[in-house]
Regions:
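Domain-level recognition of soluble alpha/beta enzyme cores
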Residues: 138-173
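Hydrophobic packing residues within well-ordered alpha-helices of enzyme cores
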Residues: 78-82, 106, 133-134
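Active-site-proximal alpha-helix that buttresses catalytic centers in soluble enzyme cores
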Residues: 15-101, 141-144, 192-193, 198
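A polyampholytic, Gly/Pro-enriched intrinsically disordered region
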Residues: 111-122, 164-179
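Extreme N-terminus of proteins, especially the signal/transit-peptide cleavage junction
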Residues: 6-18
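Charged phosphate-binding loop/patch that engages nucleotide di/tri-phosphates or the phosphate backbone
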Residues: 168-198
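A glycine-rich beta-strand to alpha-helix segment
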Residues: 118-135
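Short phosphate-binding loop-to-helix
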Residues: 98-115
Length: 198
């Protein structure tokens, strides 16, 4: 497993809207006798779906400043495909601590590792933790199959304040599943709005 990198220093606070994309890794192969769960790779279907997801995000001009991923092979592979498909040059962190982590650990990683001059972060993780955070922030029960991406916006002044509290709840903007926009279901257009690139 890779070692946990040093925590980045924080810059001055910003009032800009923060965008957080939470993704469950794409479909992975079953565990083989000679390998551990940590080493499981994506299936061909998982690779294809991730590439479709990257294309959808890219077509909407989504901007990503930082990628935070579990250090497991299937999450790193998912993050690699998203970065390549979106032609990203974002900062990248693969963290052992996020392997099968609970929801609060993903939330803490967003708060602890994002820099204040960054406006968007993309997080790739596992269930039940990543689904738990998506449902907690969305304040509703949602199905989170593999390769689901939930796009949230936060008006928090700093990344440290992004976590959900009684006075602050990140807003669910869009849900992508199977490489396509699954929510909201817009009756007037086939192309629901996603946060645009600044």
């Amino acid at each position: 497993m890779t070692s946990v990198p040093n925590r980045p220093r924080r810059s001055n606070g910003s009032n800009a809207i923060k965008t957080i994309l939470l993704m469950r890794h794409a479909k992975a192969a079953a565990e083989e006798p000679h390998e551990s769960d940590f080493q499981r790779c994506l299936t061909e279907d998982g690779i294809r779906t991730t590439c479709e997801t990257a294309a959808t995000l890219l077509s909407h001009g989504i901007r990503i400043d930082r990628i935070i991923s579990s250090a497991a092979e299937r999450t790193r592979q998912t993050a690699d495909l998203i970065a390549a498909g979106m032609q990203l040059t974002a900062a990248r962190m693969d963290l052992d601590e996020l392997y099968l982590a609970p929801a609060k650990k993903f939330e803490r990683a967003i708060c602890d590792y994002s820099l204040e001059d960054e406006s968007s972060v993309f997080v790739v993780g596992h269930n039940p933790g990543i689904a738990g955070l998506i449902c907690d922030w969305a304040d509703q029960s949602l199905s989170v199959p593999t390769a689901t991406v939930a796009v949230f916006e936060s008006s928090a002044d700093t990344w440290h304040d992004v976590r959900r509290t009684k006075v602050h709840i990140p807003k669910l903007v869009c849900l992508l599943q199977h490489g396509k926009v699954a929510w909201p279901h817009d009756q007037t257009t086939s192309d629901p709005e996603l946060p645009e690139k600044s």
